[in-house]
Amino acid sequence: MVKQMIHRLKFSIYAVTRLLVITSYIAWPVDSFAEPPRGVDCVATELLPSSIVACADVSDLGGVLETVLNHPLRAKLEAMPVYVGLMASGAPGQLQMGLRAFEASMGKPWQEALDKLTDGGITVALDASDGGVAVLVHSSDSELLERFRGFILALRQMQGAAAKQGDYRGFMADMVSDKLKMVRMHDWLLLTNNGELGKAIIDQYLDRNSDTLATNEAYVAAAKNLDASDAAHRVVSAFLDIKTLRDAGVAKGVFNEKIDNFAGEVALGGVLANLRHTPYVTGQLQLTTAGLALKLAAPHQRNWESPREYFFGEPELATAPALLEVPNRLFALSTHRDLSQMWLRSGDLLTDRGNDQLAVADTALTTFFSGRDFGEDILGLLA
């Protein structure tokens, strides 16, 4: 056993040393790239094409890591028998070795390195024209970004993969998997699974003469709504072009007038009704030591509500009750719905299949409540 442990230790040290050597060999000096083009100081939305239908921005990854790692629950989780057993098994050893190799390549602790690498933000985008995905990482330290590029390529070479590179307009594109390409553009790092999307982003980076997501009408309106909302503790902001997806026939079941599931109607009925008309949806993820909150918003008009308007209750009471604050709360849901009328008039809301299932449940519940009608007598008490 001791010999095996020593052997593994030697192998790990060898692996790290080899990784560092390969990283140093691969990484290009920062000044080997041409000077950044004029006016290159931009944001990700000014580089992405206008055909982007979904994007999410992580503005402060360093802050997220700090909040999670210093969370009051961390000590409790680490004291749990499951966690203690996992650590004793040696399973996290490879992860720890990888972190040490990453720190050695970056020349600083991993948290500090990730914070610096992403201090300009991370943007993930989906393109409508070809389904391509692009990830843009913006850093204030181009030298550290080049070190990271070298680290990724070194990992690929250690796995036995042959180095594959190609040049486009003076930038080197590296294959980091069978479908994923990586390009460093000065203080930007681009990852994409679609060559044409990558070329469009590089063209815009150099030329700045095409329509972009920043000029997309739906995105401009969504960005204004996000800017007007409370940005406190926001760690992720997102945009989804519902109209483009709806017109393209994507996820047709989501945009149907009626759904199969009553529980889904209770929780999402009003949202789904709105999705059939709204041009876009925005999302915000907020993180504090008290918890995680997801907020979704979309443009709305009163004439979109029929036939569901009645089932939300009286208009002057159209606000969901405040969530109950109880110790150790893991999940809570508050919704503003007239459950009794929803149940009684389910034919207006659910498909035939959903109504058949509801009829079976109604019979069973009426029997359980000694013959009292569940929709009228029981749910009516909640109105």
Model regions: which residues?
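A short, solvent-exposed beta-edge/loop patch
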Residues: 56, 173-206, 333
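Short, solvent-exposed loop/turn segments at the edges of secondary structure
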Residues: 18, 29, 130, 183-186, ...
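Structural boundary/hinge residues at secondary-structure and domain interfaces
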Residues: 33-175, 217-289, 293-383
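N-terminal secretory signal peptides that target proteins for export/translocation
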Residues: 1-13
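A short alpha->loop->secondary-structure connector
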Residues: 152-158, 198-216
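Mixed-charge (acidic/basic) macromolecular-recognition segments
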Residues: 188, 207-209, 220-222
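Bacterial N-terminal signal peptides
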Residues: 14-28
